[in-house]
């Protein structure tokens, strides 16, 4: 599989939690790519890729809309980017 990179702005975000605990399981971002902002890309990432717990809280509360993001990973069969690298800026 090829590695894929998307750079753009966060349009929407949410945090999915494990059913058996209150620990975050996955962060999901809708990203508007710089080159094609109407072609939204869904980025899924483990919380461990976030720089700090503040980002986790802000993404879960939708406080990061419009923030720049760069994500690198592989496209899964659904067309979502499974991120292995994530760079977030405020």
Region spans (language model):
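OB-fold and OB-like single-stranded nucleic-acid-recognition modules
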Residues: 1-90
